[in-house]
Amino acid sequence: MTPTLRTLPIGPGPGFWPELARQLIDAAPDLSRVRVLVPTYVHIVHLRQALAGHLGSSFIPPEIRTLSDWLAALPPGDEPPPAAPGERLMELYAQLRELGWLKKLFDAKRNTDLLPLARTLLSLADELTAALLPAALAQPEDVEDRWHAALQQLSPQAAALLSSESQLVWNLWHAQRDARDPGVVRHAMLQRLARSADRPLFWCAPYEPGALETEFLNTHAQHQPVTVFRLDWSAHALPLTWQRCWNELCDDSSTGAVTLTVPPALPDSLSLHPARSLEHEAQSAASTIIGWLQQGLQKLLIVPQDRVVARRVRALLERAQVVVADETGWKLSTTRAAAVLAAWLDLVAAQGRPQPLLDFIKSPFLFADPDAEGELRLSVERALATGELPSGWPGIKACMDDLPEAKRLIDIMAREAERFSGRRTVPEWVAITLGAFDALGMLAAMKEDVAGSQVMAMMESLASECEAIDAEFSLAEWRALLNLQLEQSEFVALRVDQRVRMVPLNGVPLREFDAAIIVGADAAHLPSPPADTLFFANSVRRELGLATREERARQQLRDFACLLMSCPRVVVSWRTQIDGEANLVSPWLQRLQLELRRETALVKEAVLPAHEVQVGTATFTEQLPQMPAPRAPALLPAHLSASGYNSLMACPYQFFASRMLRLREAEELSELPEKRDYGQWLHRLLQRYHETVAEQGTPVEQRAALMDTISDEVFAAALERQPAALGYAMRWKKHAPAYVEWANTREAEGWRFAFGEQERKVTLDIAGHSLTLMGRLDRLDKHDDGRLAVIDYKTADKGALKKKLASLDDHQLAFYGLLMSPRPAEAAYVAIDSDKTEALTAEPYDEWCDALEQRLVQDLEGIARGEPLPASGVSSSCQYCDARGVCRKGAW
């Protein structure tokens, strides 16, 4: 047999595999003595089924495999092992970060900005290798001539912008193309395979072979015959409708004269589903898939042109217990395991700031017991929110003194975080990161999780690939590398059910499905937006033999046509409106519709049919909500504060939810100081000021200096933890003289500071229940004549305080009177955050206290008797109420 290479085109459509099987049987009666290469393992199944259709169940099949599988089985040769992706990336990055001119050229503000650039440069170098390596090895001068000819295609303006970047890529390609270049190694292995060929080869692929594969086939044909089966895109192999609408599908342009007099045929397989919204499109797609399954269809396809819609479809199907075998590949960065890794590195970089700590302890891998996880997380959050916001690990630890389990965990975190310092090699960074997870007890849980095990494997692979690199990297560079790897890696989910598959459009050719639905087939997503061709203009790519935008768009259209011709049912779905604006269907379908409508006189049904979706309905009994008014005498609280009683007065249901059921939102943790923190600082410094004056008898003329000293000390400690407190420090410095002047005047009137910041309690008997009233007094003054006065510091506006006292809506001062025996003679709010400090006295105070005592006992006894607690609060009380979502005001 004389070795030959021949090409046999087969038209796209459902008959591709049966025709290939027939031609294979005709060409090789003894199938066991030939080898067939197909693109993927799925195609192996299709070919075997087609052969069985011709030969029956009893036959010896040919050797059917993929090219990658064949290469992997090749015994080691003289080629060195190819450089691993991680090794190539970090070696190139380590070189690029030393080039100051390169940072200036690409406007890189930080070294880490060069890491994505390094990946892009390597990708372009690999693309050049795949297209030009055989020519570069055979005739290097011709390749250089092609390069210079390509640059000549640029306009002078484009050349001025792109010449430096393009030359950089070209030089990098020459520098990277050594014996360990993956493309060079692959080429050598392919040639070794071809030279050792021992049987005829049948090559089957939906696309034209690349330069390396073409060289492989040519070499193989010199030793054993090669037959290439490819898709036939000539005019005679395509339906006339497709030729009329999409003439760029064809390899030749001689279709017009043949088809002008022939009316276009309405495609039998295609129907359209215009959706009103994203949710409507997703629900319709999910209902369509479920309907097909109920009809007994077993091979269903979802083409996710719009990933947002596709995610929603998948969620709806999983809710219906229909598992989707996703071949599109979700980014590993979107998994919760990757989020935990990112949260840990954020915490390390933040050096123990509270918010990153709270984000990290939400990790599902950190606690073996979910109940303990919730309790510990809540206790840590409360500990951080109750006092001043701590800064750094020492401050965090100090907040956990009453939480031994939390403190133990924080100690481990702080110890492990200290190891993330300095510059280290990639394997060292991997070891430190995995060591931290092990110390925190997370490693086992991560490995048991599907995504977690893949994240661990990715890091271990990265360490192995970069073992030979001596360059050291900072924590910021390590984080950037991990983020890049997680973004580039695909999450491979376990596939249990294979009936419904989600496959990208370029994975559809030569595959068989019973029905398919394309979601997101609007003009923005079908065809997919062209990928950026950085560094090389389209004309340069064309001259060098690289894929151009036009070629990629044409290939997308051919993939789409393959689906329409091979699948008996295809539904195309899209949203007709987005944000109130019209959203057009894919231009490919617009062209098809126009072509059909143009021939209305010849074709009765000139419009593509609409897909009817059968959505299941459910009947519910309507029950109008009513205002809640629970009765809960058994839940009468054992303790009550002034704010708690104010809540009862504002809305009984709010009191029921917050004080009796204890349904309170966790306080939000802000890393910036708030007015609450400002109030705590003022309370602290005023307490110190008055105690010092009382103990030392500080003369009046020295008190302003004393206030400045104490204020500086208190705010210096605050600024050390939170530099953003500077604004509050300057604010108090402006108002402090007014307070000192007011305090001196009050002392001259006979009032003396007695004590401050003191807890007071009193126990009442409420219908047989013991209930303790409790509160913390800011300050108590005693007059020379023996009278007592309650002082409460306020940073609120004077007008708001006066309004509060006049309306008697706030019972705080009167409530404090109930805690004192003997009862104070007067009480006042002191507005301290003002240019003029002023005491706003509650009058008549004694009558107010008596009325409050009578009403408080009456209200609490009513609760103990089982009186209702209606949601009767006014709008101002509801505006910021945590129980609003529980009482559902507005729905009744």
Enumerate the language-model features and the residues they cover.
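C-terminal accessory regions
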Residues: 365, 546-597, 816, 857-880
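Metal-dependent nuclease catalytic regions and adjoining charged, substrate-binding loops involved
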Residues: 817-892
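Non-catalytic protein-protein interaction segments used by genome-maintenance enzymes to assemble
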Residues: 755-823
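Active-site-adjacent bridging/hinge elements
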Residues: 262, 535-541, 652-663, 708-712, ...
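Short, glycine-/Ser/Thr-/acidic-enriched flexible segments
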Residues: 13, 43, 208, 233-235, ...
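Short, contiguous acidic/charged loop-to-helix segments that flank catalytic cores in large enzymes
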Residues: 469, 491-492, 547-551, 669-673, ...
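Nucleic acid-machinery interaction/catalytic patches
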Residues: 1-544, 548, 597-601, 667, ...
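C-terminal, charged and often intrinsically disordered regions of DNA end-processing helicases
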Residues: 286, 293, 590-690, 874-875, ...
